Amino acid sequence: MFEYPQGYKLIAGVDEVGRGPLVGAVVTAAVILDPHNPIEGLADSKKLSEKKRLALAEEIKEKARAWALGRAEADEIDEINILQASLLAMTRAVKSLKIQPHFVLIDGNKIPKDLAIPAQAVVKGDSLVAEISAASILAKVARDQEMEELDKQYPEYAFAQHKGYPTKLHLEKLAELGALPQHRRSFAPVKKALEQF
């Protein structure tokens, strides 16, 4: 059981999706839930079916007091590394909220330095904290939709299937077709593909 910090009225949960993929942005979400408007079935986005995630994402957007997305693009990831880019994207999500929270709960073990709001990192927060679960669902749905859009542009890479993660199929496509502008140049398999072409 997670114990919420005491004395804070508006608490935001923050999570990121897309640290592991070789392509595209790392996407984050920040969510302030409404205690008078509970959402059933919130869980870590990775443990939910796509259908369930999509339904919950709509419900979160409808019922949350505030929600926002943040992102760091592939070129930013290459410039400052994936961890720093994830933290930057988290800060962007929090700053984009229409209501500023009094406290922020962040999935993982790191807190962005420039948040300027009291915060706590929660390991396995996406399973323990409803606000972080909600954020993980919004971020995952948003990023998956981006991969589906990329798939329409470059169907030969099968992005809708692997969502940019370094699966056997994605690595085969990289070796065969080379890297796209959206690929993260600092990631080893992409570097290798760039050297071959």
UniProtKB/Swiss-Prot annotation:
User: Any idea which UniProt keywords this protein has?
Assistant: Cytoplasm, Endonuclease, Hydrolase, Manganese, Metal-binding, Nuclease
* PROSITE patterns to which the protein is assigned, alphabetical: RNASE_H_2 (PS51975)
Q: Which reaction does it catalyse?
A: Endonucleolytic cleavage to 5'-phosphomonoester
BP GO terms, sorted: DNA replication, removal of RNA primer; mismatch repair
Q: Does the keyword Plastid apply?
A: no
Organism superkingdom: Bacteria
Q: Into which EC class is this enzyme placed? A: hydrolase
Q: One short Pfam family name for this protein?
A: RNase_HII
Question: At which positions is a divalent metal cation bound?
Answer: 15-16, 107
Q: Does the keyword Cytoplasm apply?
A: yes
> By its UniProt entry, which InterPro entries does this protein fall under?
RNase_HII, RNase_HII/HIII, RNase_HII/HIII_dom, RNaseH-like_sf, RNaseH_sf
Q: Which cofactor does it need?
A: Mn(2+); Mg(2+)
Cofactor: binding comment: Manganese or magnesium. Binds 1 divalent metal ion per monomer in the absence of substrate. May bind a second metal ion after substrate binding.
Q: What is its main location?
A: cytoplasm
Report the GO molecular function annotations. manganese ion binding; RNA binding; RNA-DNA hybrid ribonuclease activity
Q: Where in the cell is it found?
A: Cytoplasm
Q: Which SUPFAM superfamilies does the annotation name?
A: Ribonuclease H-like
Q: Where in this chain does the record put each RNase H type-2 domain?
A: 9-197
E.C. numbers? 3.1.26.4
GO cellular component annotations, sorted alphabetically? cytoplasm; ribonuclease H2 complex
- Please explain the role this protein plays, according to its UniProt record: Endonuclease that specifically degrades the RNA of RNA-DNA hybrids.
Assigned protein family:
Belongs to the RNase HII family.
Protein name (database record): Ribonuclease HII
Q: Can you name the source organism?
A: Haemophilus influenzae (strain ATCC 51907 / DSM 11121 / KW20 / Rd)
**Species classification:** Bacteria, Pseudomonadati, Pseudomonadota, Gammaproteobacteria, Pasteurellales
Q: Which gene encodes it?
A: rnhB
